[in-house]
């Protein structure tokens, strides 16, 4: 548990500090476009690096959200309709459901021209995630440990045929209900890019800053601090209480772990619906920086065109849907994007832009030396 607190703290602090650098660079550089800052700092190479990182990061984020729709929505429909046999039912096929949700819900919201209209949907998605966190905390005091549940035992039947004594011991032994305060293994290392991925909001910072009423860098930093603290607290509490509920039996997909223990729990079903609503309403927000990046890269000097706006939006959604349908798991996407594009957007590009564009501070100043070592 301690390593999660340490990793969350460091990643959130570095991410927030890079937001500070980005806002300061935007003021000094005279641009509120991430790609334009890259162009002013390093020419075409900087512009391509910024645009490529933003596109990769946000497509990865969209893919992760649509993966949740793909795997969770069929289970919700199955539970609501009380269906046992799922063979041949198209509305329980995750691929079809992702396409349907993208076409009916996500595409109309994504076609909106201004980001401000999505503030209400973003607020609703945040409330859904708060509800998810509350349920995770409450279930900690409802589910007893050790987990003596028939569904879990049935999952282990094949293994217990060869090692019945050992497996029975693992289910009932009290040691399995004792938290391990510090664990360092390959999974811990793998968590670093995932946490990095989860704290990337930098492509959306400048568009939000541009539309902020009474815009000032200080006000935007206050908004960022509140947002980062809220996300830090939610991530920490969800991880902590999820682990303290299932200990060694916790899975990477927390809702799946609850489903194995509480197959027909109404509250968990409502949580699934809330999570689905949250991720579905978040996708249009993520599309905005991708579309802006592509538009600025391909046709920066042209006036707004609904035809071009719609074509880019449909192309982004179509590509992401293909990715979700044909890639088997989101874990590889999290790891790859977190280690590449997310690291660029948090650690490298804001620091590089700051060093290059903020001229009033000398290169030998404490802040620039610290930034250069950090990047």
Regions found by a protein language model. Give the residues of each.
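Transmembrane helix interruption/hinge and helix-loop junction motifs
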Residues: 1-2, 113-114, 326-330
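Membrane-interfacial loop- and helix-cap regions that link adjacent transmembrane helices
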Residues: 31-51, 63-98, 122-125, 133-342, ...
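Juxtamembrane transmembrane-helix boundary signature
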Residues: 8-42, 57, 66
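Alpha-helical transmembrane segments and their membrane-interface exit regions
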Residues: 14-18, 129, 342-348
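Loop-to-helix transition at the N-terminal end of transmembrane alpha-helices
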Residues: 1-13, 125-127, 337-342
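Membrane-embedded alpha-helical segments of transport systems
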Residues: 11-15, 55-63, 127-128, 230-234
């Amino acid at each position: 548990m301690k390593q999660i607190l340490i990793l969350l703290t460091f990643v959130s602090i570095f991410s927030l500090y890079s937001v500070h650098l980005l806002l300061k660079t935007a003021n000094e550089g005279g641009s509120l476009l991430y790609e334009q800052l890259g162009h002013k700092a390093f020419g075409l190479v900087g512009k391509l690096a910024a645009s490529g990182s933003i596109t990769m990061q946000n497509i990865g984020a969209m893919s992760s959200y649509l993966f949740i729709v793909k795997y969770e929505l069929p289970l919700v429909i199955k539970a609501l309709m009380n269906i046992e046999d799922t063979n041949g039912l198209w509305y329980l096929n995750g691929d079809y459901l992702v396409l349907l949700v993208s076409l009916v819900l996500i595409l109309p919201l994504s076609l909106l021209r201004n980001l401000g209209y999505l503030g209400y949907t973003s607020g609703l998605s945040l409330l859904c995630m708060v509800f998810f966190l509350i349920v995770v905390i409450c279930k900690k005091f409802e589910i007893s440990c050790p987990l003596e549940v028939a569904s879990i035992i049935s999952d282990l039947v094949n293994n217990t045929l060869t090692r019945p004594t050992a497996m029975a011991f693992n289910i009932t032994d009290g040691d399995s209900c004792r938290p391990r305060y510090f664990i360092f293994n390959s999974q811990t290392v793998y968590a670093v890019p995932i946490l990095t991925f989860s704290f990337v909001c930098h492509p959306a910072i400048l568009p939000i800053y541009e539309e902020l009423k009474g815009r000032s860098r200080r006000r935007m930093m206050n908004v960022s601090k509140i947002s980062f603290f809220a996300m830090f607290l939610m991530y920490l509490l969800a991880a902590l209480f999820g682990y303290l509920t299932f200990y060694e039996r916790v899975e990477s997909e927390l809702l799946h772990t609850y489903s194995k223990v509480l197959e027909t729990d109404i509250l968990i079903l409502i949580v699934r619906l809330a999570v689905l609503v949250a991720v579905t309403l978040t996708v249009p927000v993520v599309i905005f920086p991708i579309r802006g990046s592509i538009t600025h890269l391909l046709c920066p000097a042209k006036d707004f065109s609904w035809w071009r706006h719609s074509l880019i939006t449909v192309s982004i959604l179509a590509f992401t849907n293909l990715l979700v349908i044909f890639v088997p798991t989101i874990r590889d996407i999290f790891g790859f994007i977190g280690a590449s594009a997310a690291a660029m957007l948090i650690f490298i590009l804001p620091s590089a832009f700051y060093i290059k564009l903020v001229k009033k501070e000398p290169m030998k100043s404490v802040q620039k030396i610290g930034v250069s070592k950090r990047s």
